[in-house]
Each structure stands twice: as structure tokens, then as C-alpha cells.
Amino acid sequence: MVLIRVLANLLILQLSYAQKASELIIGGDECNINEHRFLVALYTSRSRRFHCSGTLINQEWVLTAANCDRKNIRIKLGMHSKNVTNEDEQTRVPKEKFFCLSSKTYTKWDKDIMLIRLKRPVNDSPHIAPISLPSSPPSVGSVCRIMGWGTISPTKVSYPDVPHCANINLLDYEVCRAAHGGLPATSRTLCAGILEGGKDSCQGDSGGPLICNGQFQGILSWGVHPCGQRLKPGVYTKVSDYTEWIRSIIAGNTDVTCPP
């Protein structure tokens, strides 16, 4: 009973904060074409359907979620509209893919991360540029930016032509524990959303970035369906917990293991 009261009070406090912060929300609309130069789209050569997003972290490497892995992945960089091609759009295929513990094993709360080495590097251009790994973990209460080409309807699949962006709040992990049964006491994930609902990542946005105070802090891992439900924030892989693993692989130490 004590735990229930504590979590209830925490939810009330977080909801109060979210209601104030929601007045600042820009999202739910088309992203500015200049704000997502690091955002990439993943699709398969067979279906040609975009199923995930990812983040360019340097000219040769993309970070996304392990649940986005498919055979014959193609990676589209520099894209805004699916139907109107930018002059500097480029397509790449993976040269190598790295998972934690050299496997594809992950859970809803751990190790949902995939590092992709591109077969050919890309150059910076008007619509392509990497974003750095975070210098420090994010703080609860931060306003964070989500983006992607995922469905814009919470109940049916309705993929937009252009990426949509929204601002959500970084919440205490205990909020996600209260909202989603089965989460452990600790995990290498972030909890983010708008507790009164209406703003959320959704189907097709997996693997995309969570940008908090200008830093790349999270990778969309999972959420509930229908999307955008009240008191049901999303779960994001915590990038700052994996920076050492990422940097080691990029430096050539491919035998490095993920944090426990």
C-alpha cells in the first residue's frame, strides 16, 4: 500500500509537470527540414517499406534499436519527403551490424540497441550530418524531441509523407514501472512521454532518436498500442549507458561486451 501511494503521488507530480510543459509542445507536426540531418530511415529491399528510424552518429555509423534488424536492410539518409527527393539523398547498406553480447538477444528493458557500420561512408551535406553521442546522462524533467516517419494515428496505420516531430517530457523511471507491469527495479532505459496523453512515438518510429536539450539521449524501444494513451509513456534505450561500448566498436575493438 505504501508503494502504491508513493507511485500515485509521483504520477500526480509528473502529470502536473507534464501539463505545464505541454504548453510548449511544438510537435505532432511536420519536422523542420533542417532539424533532422542525423535522422535516417530503415527499409528492406524486398518490401521497400520504411519500418524504423535510426541516427547517424558519424559518417560511417548508424545507431538504432535491435528490434529494427531485418534481412536486406537499406538505409536512407538525407530524406525529408518520401515522394520528393532531396538532391543530396543517399542510400547505404550495412557492412557490419553489432548487437550487445554479439547476439540479437534483448528484452523490453535491456539491450535493445544495434550499431550499424555503413558499407560506404557518407559526407556532410545540406540534409545529412551526424549528431554526437551524449556527454552526460539526461535529467528528469527535460523536454525532449522525438521524430520519425511512423504512423500519425494512434489506432490505425497512417504513415505520413514527411517526418513528424513532437516534444515530450523525460519522466522518472518509476513512472514507467507503475505504467508497465514487469519492468525491473533498474534498467538501462529512459521513460519519456506526456502523461495526459496525445503525444507519443508510434508504429514505424522504433529505433529513432530521443533528443534532450540538444543531446542524443535515447533510442525508441517500445510503447503501448494504441499509442499516446494517458499515463502510458514510452520506453527508450539509454544511450549514455552504452557510449563506451559504441566507441570501442568504432575504434576497432569488436570483442567488447555491453554493460551488464
From Swiss-Prot:
Matching entries from PROSITE patterns are given as:
TRYPSIN_DOM (PS50240), TRYPSIN_SER (PS00135)
User: Where is this chain's protein located in or outside the cell?
Assistant: Secreted
| InterPro entries, per database record | Peptidase_S1_PA (IPR009003), Peptidase_S1_PA_chymotrypsin (IPR043504), Peptidase_S1A (IPR001314), Trypsin_dom (IPR001254), TRYPSIN_SER (IPR033116)
Disulfide bridge partners, by residue number: 31-165, 52-68, 100-258, 144-212, 176-191, 202-227
Expression sites by tissue: Expressed by the venom gland.
**Which PANTHER family does this entry report, sorted A to Z?**
KALLIKREIN-1, KALLIKREIN-RELATED
| GO CC aspect terms | extracellular region; secretory granule
Q: What start and end residues bound the annotated signal peptide?
A: 1-18
Q: Which residues form the propeptide?
A: 19-24
The task this protein performs is described as: Snake venom serine protease homolog that may act in the hemostasis system of the prey.
UniProtKB keywords:
Disulfide bond, Glycoprotein, Hemostasis impairing toxin, Secreted, Serine protease homolog, Signal, Toxin
Protein known as: Snake venom serine protease homolog
* A Pfam match: Trypsin
Q: Report the superkingdom from the record.
A: Eukaryota
Q: Species name for this entry? A: Bothrops jararacussu (Jararacussu)
| One example GO MF annotation | toxin activity
